[in-house]
């Protein structure tokens, strides 16, 4: 959890409890949970999953393994191993953070018995969500312009680090604003 939405929940404890409510009360026995084992809340999610007999999957699992990751201009090339088959996938999204979301979606889809061949064929056609690493243009000096509504210190840092990693050979300029008075702690 980050500072995002704490203004609504009043404090981190309430925010965490609202998130855990999803696992404790809304997922039925035998349901699927796909999560990141690197988040601080993982142990709590794991314990709830064990208690409720939920099927827990993380990014580190025996079903999918990322073999390699490379950048190719504005795209990312992923090699994923699944059941002794290697799939090379072009991801036309900026930001390494996007890969985590894609892999979790692939795991969830696979565990929901959706056709992986179709899923892998659709990934190259994905485009950014409006306001999330969204390419909005190019200026005269050939600089790329991206829009991201990162509005917490953690989100802004993740955004900048992802852009820097993918475009390490380019100069990066950042323009950000903090409008509104809803959560002055941000």
Descriptions of predicted regions:
Residues 26-32, 50-54, 170:
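A short helix->loop->beta-strand "cap" motif at the edges of active sites that frequently abuts
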């Amino acid at each position: 959890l980050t500072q995002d939405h704490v203004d609504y929940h009043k404090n981190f404890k309430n925010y965490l409890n609202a998130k855990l409510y999803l696992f404790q009360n809304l997922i039925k026995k035998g349901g699927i949970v796909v999560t990141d084992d690197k988040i601080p809340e993982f142990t709590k999610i794991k314990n709830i999953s064990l208690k409720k007999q939920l099927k827990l999957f993380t990014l580190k699992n025996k079903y999918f393994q990322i073999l390699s990751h490379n950048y190719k201009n504005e795209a990312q090339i992923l090699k994923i191993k699944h059941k002794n088959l290697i799939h090379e996938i072009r991801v036309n999204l900026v930001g390494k953070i996007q890969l985590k979301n894609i892999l979790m979606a692939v795991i969830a889809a696979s565990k929901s018995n959706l056709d992986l061949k179709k899923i892998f064929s659709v990934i190259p056609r994905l485009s950014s969500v409006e306001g999330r690493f969204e390419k909005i243009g190019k200026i005269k000096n050939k600089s790329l312009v991206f829009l991201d509504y990162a509005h917490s210190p953690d989100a802004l840092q993740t955004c900048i680090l992802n852009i820097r990693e993918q475009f390490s050979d380019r100069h990066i300029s950042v323009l950000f604003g903090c409008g509104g008075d809803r959560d002055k702690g941000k």
